[in-house]
Amino acid sequence: MHLDLISITWGCLMATFTASLALVIWARNGL
């Protein structure tokens, strides 16, 4: 149960990082 919580938290962190990184790249290409 505890390991699942860590996995979910890490997954959300990576998803947020990937989304923000993609947004920055998209914004630069847009400009």
From Swiss-Prot:
Subcellular location: Plastid, Chloroplast thylakoid membrane
Entry's transmembrane regions: 5-25
GO CC, any one term: cytochrome b6f complex
UniProt keyword terms in alphabetical order: Chloroplast, Electron transport, Membrane, Photosynthesis, Plastid, Thylakoid, Transmembrane, Transmembrane helix, Transport
InterPro entries: Cytochr_b6-f_cplx_su8_sf, Cytochrome_b6-f_cplx_su8
Taxonomic superkingdom: Eukaryota
Pfam families, per database record: PetN (PF03742)
Keyword Glycosyltransferase: no
Membrane topology: Single-pass membrane protein
Any one GO MF annotation of this record: electron transporter, transferring electrons within cytochrome b6/f complex of photosystem II activity
Family (UniProt): Belongs to the PetN family.
Subunit structure: The 4 large subunits of the cytochrome b6-f complex are cytochrome b6, subunit IV (17 kDa polypeptide, PetD), cytochrome f and the Rieske protein, while the 4 small subunits are PetG, PetL, PetM and PetN. The complex functions as a dimer.
Protein name (database record): Cytochrome b6-f complex subunit 8
Organism: Cyanidioschyzon merolae (strain NIES-3377 / 10D)
